[in-house]
Amino acid sequence: ELPKPLRSAKEADLVGEPCPPNLLRWLATLPARVIEILDRLAEQGHGAWLVGGCVRDAWFGDEVGDIDICSTCPPEEMLNLFGNDAIPTGVEFGTVTIKGDGEHFEVTTLRTESQYRDGRHPEQVEWGTSLQEDLSRRDFTINSMAVDVARGLLYDPFEGKADMEANIIRAVGNAQLRCEEDSLRILRAYRFLERGTGQLWRMDPALKEAIQLHSKRLDMVAIERRWNEVKKILMKSGAGKILHTMMEDGVLKYIFPHCQFISPKIFDAMDRDAVKELTVPQRLSLLLVEYKPKVVFEAMKFLKTSKTTMKDTCRFHEQLRHLPQPMAGELRVFRHCLGQDAAPHLMLRKVLSTIGVTIHGMPQMNVEDIDKITAMWDTLQPSRAPSQCLVDGHWMMSRSGVGQGIRLGRLKEWLHRIQIEKDIDDRLMLERELSLLPFNHGDHEHWPKLQFP
């Protein structure tokens, strides 16, 4: 049963079918605010339906994210109807966001649209009253289903339910037109190919043909939007399989024009269980591991990633080119410098050695050498030494006799490295180490630093 009684809204111009049990269970958990929105629209004589991704995810029994509503109510009337709770987020496209209970719900007026001249947005939008027509302009059959909550009816004019049962991604109607209308649908098709199992769905041949024919239209889509879709693909369980398919279909070059060929071995590596916990920067570093650091930087710049993603990707990619020695002190410095990247770094180096992939410009490491390092790493105890240096500049000057300046700073860094290497957590022990250092002689530029590599 619904959380509260709901009056029936205007009927759809479609024949519906009773919602299956999995959808009915979801409807019974709908937020009260959603019911209130539907009820108010029905009170004014409008039709209102839950639509798109929320219906798809609920059918699978997945956690439902955004709940989207479509309605015959024009946006201007919606703004008046919901007053201060209404936000005109996309009125020109019929979308109004309704606030309530700390959440936001998008309500979009049914639309009829003309040509998409820029490959992304319709040239002209007119409000409609036909749910059939509205669903017919959506991207894929699995996203073109709607639910009448009050009547408990599912509207599925393009057989999205059958395609979900058969694990097929199919365009609504003419696949060529769908790709021409909105070129971002090309990337969305690949994103929907996998649903957490690691196995890919089949792409309908007509959709695949349309994507291959129109992939060049991706250049019409803002790179930020392309990157947003690819970022989601990168984090999927079957990311390697999806990206490999994109490369074979001639699509990946519109995402990574600087890195148009990637070894199939790397795609296979991306789908290993050990790799599935990696972050986006770590996955990007693996994907582009055969390219030089400068090329990776240009790739991140082209994608207009966030500064953090660019910095983390370039840093991890560069660090992957190096390995610590299989000695406790070296590994402690490695752990200190890389932090949470340390364990993924060693894991990836072992994976790359196992599959025979060479990092650009670096000699091939055999698995046995990596095993020596990982064996020592596995026996490494948690650090006792604090991450910050135990002593400050005043302490250094009083113990060493070295005055303020670059030489003192370099000496402190050298001592800090020793603190980490030897896992020292006591100032007296550190003072003993200082007394053994030949800091009164030699060029300070050659003193060890606390860094990796």
Regions found by a protein language model. Name each.
Residues 1-453:
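Catalytic cores of the polymerase beta-like nucleotidyltransferase superfamily
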